[in-house]
Amino acid sequence: MRYSVGVLGATGMVGQKFIQMLAEHPWFKLTSLAASERRVGKKYGEEVDWIVSREVPDIAKDIEMVPMDPKHVDADIVFSALPSDIAREVEPKFAEAGFVVASNASAYRMAEDVPLVIPEVNPEHLGLIEVQKKNRGWDGFIVTNPNCTTIVLVLSLKPLMDLGLRTVRVASMQALSGAGYPGVPSLAITDNVIPFIKGEEDKVEEEPLKLLGKFNGRKIEFADIKVSASCHRVPVIDGHTEAVWVEFDREVSVEEAKAAFESLKPLDLPTSPEKVIIVREEPDRPQPRLDRDAGNGMSITVGRIRKDGERGLKYIVLGHNTVRGAAGASILNAELMIKEKII
């Protein structure tokens, strides 16, 4: 069975990445593209300012765009690439109308009854769906994926939790595509690093606590760890690089950490990579140009794992921010829900 799917916010950068990844998906058939009022009724291929790689997929070219209204969208699942302020208004309307909303937006990530999910990290948090539907009286529901920087970070932290992880410090070097299009002005970022991204550090410090927490049948009990973040925009197109310092409640060797990273098992899902975490031994890896497309953009790459004091380690982690960190994350969540027979 193939499920009909739609994209909310279809013309933006993440919306385009959704369309690119859904075009030949074995489980999903792209049927609806929703956009702003000025684009309604126009064919996607004629109206979109296509900025991701390759051409507009044939399946999307002749689809007439519709309003962001449940009455006009013909789909079983909608993927939301909306800005947070618009998502806060639009997504509940779709959930109330019975749609499955797989959202990349930040609007409902930290809501108590909304699952914030990375399939390899906390699939059991999907149990919140029934809590959400009961609380809100909806026929459908919203499931979210984290911020792009958070996803890359937490995929690397999950295997370390069993080693007694207590404290995390992270400095991100975030790609320009994370700011959308047209994004950061060229004169602001050329020959420069911008040491501030509005709202980003709060997300990176808060979201991991929910993701790594426990579902008790009613709500998420947040993880008992501390995360401190400093986020920076750098002149790279795609691929977020993060320098991470971690402390444990005991001494942990580099070899233990490597084994833990490599133990994170992939899922038997269409968008899942063969290896979730790739560990590089070279002293100068990972790098965005060399490693962002690993696993078709769905793997993360860890390198430069070193001791840092008696109970600490430090390492570099990199992931593709618009694939694993955005569209691919929502698609993987939808695949997981199908596998678990939630959809």
From Swiss-Prot:
Q: Which GO terms describe its biological process?
A: 'de novo' L-methionine biosynthetic process; diaminopimelate biosynthetic process; lysine biosynthetic process via diaminopimelate; threonine biosynthetic process
Active-site residues, Swiss-Prot/TrEMBL: C148 (acyl-thioester intermediate), H240 (proton acceptor)
Keyword flag Oxidoreductase: yes
* Residues binding NADP(+), per UniProt: T11, G12, M13, V14, S177, G178, N321, T322
Q: Which GO terms describe its molecular function?
A: aspartate-semialdehyde dehydrogenase activity; NAD binding; NADP binding; protein dimerization activity
- What top-level class of enzyme does the UniProt entry assign? oxidoreductase
Alphabetical list of CDD domains matching this protein: ASADH_C_arch_fung_like, ScASADH_like_N
| Keywords recorded for this protein, A-Z | Amino-acid biosynthesis, Diaminopimelate biosynthesis, Lysine biosynthesis, Methionine biosynthesis, NADP, Oxidoreductase, Threonine biosynthesis
Q: Which InterPro entries match?
A: ASADH-related (IPR051823), Asp-semialdehyde_DH_CS (IPR000319), Asp_semi-ald_DH_pep-lack (IPR005676), Asp_semialdehyde_DH (IPR012080), NAD(P)-bd_dom_sf (IPR036291), Semialdehyde_DH_NAD-bd (IPR000534), Semialdhyde_DH_dimer_dom (IPR012280)
Keyword set includes DNA repair = no
What pathway is this protein a component of?
A: Amino-acid biosynthesis; L-lysine biosynthesis via DAP pathway; (S)-tetrahydrodipicolinate from L-aspartate: step 2/4; Amino-acid biosynthesis; L-methionine biosynthesis via de novo pathway; L-homoserine from L-aspartate: step 2/3; Amino-acid biosynthesis; L-threonine biosynthesis; L-threonine from L-aspartate: step 2/5
| Catalysed reactions, as listed in the record | L-aspartate 4-semialdehyde + phosphate + NADP(+) = 4-phospho-L-aspartate + NADPH + H(+)
Domain of life according to the entry: Archaea
Stated EC number for the protein is 1.2.1.11
List positions binding phosphate.
R109, K203
A Pfam family name for this chain?
A: Semialdhyde_dhC
Which of this chain's residues are annotated to bind substrate?
Q174, E200, R233
General function of this protein: Catalyzes the NADPH-dependent formation of L-aspartate-semialdehyde (L-ASA) by the reductive dephosphorylation of L-aspartyl-4-phosphate.
Q: Which family does it belong to?
A: Belongs to the aspartate-semialdehyde dehydrogenase family.
Q: How does it assemble?
A: Homodimer.
By what name is this protein known? Aspartate-semialdehyde dehydrogenase
* Gene name linked to the record: asd
